[in-house]
Structure formats: structure tokens, C-alpha cells
Amino acid sequence: MERRRITSARRSYASSETMVRGHGPTRHLGTIPRLSLSRMTPPLPARVDFSLAGALNAGFKETRASERAEMMELNDRFASYIEKVRFLEQQNKALAAELNQLRAKEPTKLADVYQAELRELRLRLDQLTTNSARLEVERDNLTQDLGTLRQKLQDETNLRLEAENNLAVYRQEADEATLARVDLERKVESLEEEIQFLRKIHEEEVRELQEQLAQQQVHVEMDVAKPDLTAALREIRTQYEAVATSNMQETEEWYRSKFADLTDVASRNAELLRQAKHEANDYRRQLQALTCDLESLRGTNESLERQMREQEERHARESASYQEALARLEEEGQSLKEEMARHLQEYQDLLNVKLALDIEIATYRKLLEGEENRITIPVQTFSNLQIRETSLDTKSVSEGHLKRNIVVKTVEMRDGEVIKESKQEHKDVM
């Protein structure tokens, strides 16, 4: 039964050894502690005393019973270790498959997703930059047109102010001409009144003289001829009338000339005033048209500025959303990297556990082989013992592979003394 258990344990170890393979960073595991079988079989002398055979047989039976119990316990532990190794191998395979899947698919897929989204984001950013540049060019053109229209409006305003100033001057000249005409009319009226007054005075003087002549009836008889007073008065009257007529004619001629001059000036001023009013109306219409154009351009400019602000705000929002998306993707990538690192760490830990279990299994196998060899050796040859020391050293050959060196050290002892020692090295690549 013990042999069957050992054979089944060997078979289980062989099957598990063929299944256990892994990849991961190397780690120096050191050497396995030296194993000694001196505690199980005490050294025997070279010559056997047959008188002590019974005692030796009794001691051997007790030793065999204790060794059998110890082997059963070790066998049970070995079976539990094998079950644990199988369970860990299954987990190792699942983790290795998941790791290979992550290595094969996730980075490439994630990189493709990143590249596609980055290309889309760059394309949209280029479009937004182009639209922004186009809107800036349109805004600059509209600003230039607005400056030109403002300059034209300023020129037209200056012309309107100049026309208003000329109109004010013309109005002042017309007022002055009106005042001059009124003054001349007043002077003509005063001259007519003066002529009437002088005529009345002259008539009164003539009447007084006639009355005086009628009252005085002086008859002077002289040798000379009598003077003709009526002729003298008539002559005086004629002279006064001639003077008055000439004065009136001169006054009328001067009044007519002045009135004609004032009429010409007034007509010219009226024509200039009419032209100024016409020009003012034209300027007013042009000013209204330019004001309407300016208002429309202001509305267009405000609309374009509003659209530009909306575009900038939308661009800022989209940029913020893209930045958030990039940050989120980077966080997801970082979390995936951390998860991958965690899986790798777990895989490394499981690999270390597996290597430790492999070492322990190898140790138990060596113990079992030594036990089988000791069982097959006759009693009289118990003085020759072989102790093997196994050490494992793992060195990194390349990434993803482990190189395991198994050193088997054989020591032959007789009477507690080392008489022969040999060492064998086996290389195993995992």
C-alpha cells in the first residue's frame, strides 16, 4: 500500500510537472538546505554482531514503524500539496490566458481607440481653428469697412456742418439785406414826408405872401414902371417846384437803384438759400441713408461678434469636453496599466509559490527516492549511506523564460566519515 501511494504521488508529480510552465521575472531562490538521513538510520559498524541481531531487529522494526507513520504523514501532506499545486496551476493558467489576452488585444485596441479619438479630436480642432480664423478675417474686413463708413460719415458730417455754416452766413446776409431794405424804405418814407412838409411850408408861405399882397394896397406912383410881383412869385414857385421835382426825381432814382440792388441781392441770396436748402436736404437724405447703413452694419457686426463669441464658447466647451475625455481615457489607461501590473504581480506571486512548491515537491521526491533506495539496500550494507543535496538556482535567460539549474550532490559516508563526494548539475529551461 505504501508503494502504491508513493507511485501515485510520483505519477501525480510527473503529471503536474509536465503541466507547470510559466513566464515572469526571474528570482534567485537560493539553495535547498542540506538533507541528512542520519536521524532516520543510525550508522552501522562494518562488522555485524549476530548476538545483537534481535535487538537490532526490534530497533529496526520500531524505526520502520515510525518511518512508516512519518511517510504516511508526509504522503498525506504531499497529496494536499499536489492538490494545491493543481489548483494554483489552474489559476496560473487562467491568469496566463488573461495576461496573454491583455497583452495581445487590450493595448492594441486601446491604442487604436486612442488614435482614432485623437485623430477625430485633431480634425475637429483643425475645423474649429479654421472657422475661427475665417471669422476673424471676416471680423477684420467688417471692422475695416466700418472704419471706412465712419470716415465717410465724418466727411459727410463735415460737409453738412460747412453747408449749415454757409446757410447761416447766407441767412445773416439775407437778414442784413432785409434790414438795409427796411432802412431804405424808412428813409424814402422820411424823405417823402419831408417833401410833403416842405411842400406844405411852401404853399403856406405862398399863401401868406398872397394874403400880405392882398392886404397891402399900396399904390406907388413912380416914374418907373411898376414891378410884376405875380411873375416874380410865379418864377419863385417855378424854381421851388423845379428844385422839389429834381430832388424827388433824384430821391426816386436813388431809391429805385437801391431797391433794385437790394432786390438783386435778395434774389441772389434767395437763390443761394434755395440751393443751400436743396443741398441740405440732399445731405440730410444722404445722412439718413448712411445712418441706416451704419445701423445695419452695426447690427451685422454685433451679430457676427455674437456668433464669434458663441463659436468661442462652443469651442471652449468642446475643448473642455475633449480634455475631460482625454483625461478620462488616460485614467482608464492608467487603471488598466495598474490592473495589468496587479495581475502581473499576482502572477509573479503565484509563480513564486509554484516554484517554492516545485522545490518542496523535488525535496519530497528526493526523500521518497532515498527512502526507496534505503528500503532496497540489505541490512548489512546500511553503513554505506548516500546523501544528496539538491539546490535550485533560477537565472534569467530571456524575458518570459526561466532557466533552472538542479545540482545533485552525493556524499558517501562510512562510520560517520565522508569517504566519497560527487556533484551533478542538471539544467532545465521552463
Curated annotation (Swiss-Prot):
Residues 9-18 have a biased composition (Polar residues). Phosphorylated by PKN1. Keywords: Citrullination, Coiled coil, Cytoplasm, Intermediate filament, Methylation, Phosphoprotein. Residues 67-375 form the IF rod domain. Residues 103-113 are annotated as: Linker 1. Residues 114-212 are annotated as: Coil 1B. The keyword Coiled coil applies. It is found in: Cytoplasm. Interacts with SYNM. This is Glial fibrillary acidic protein.
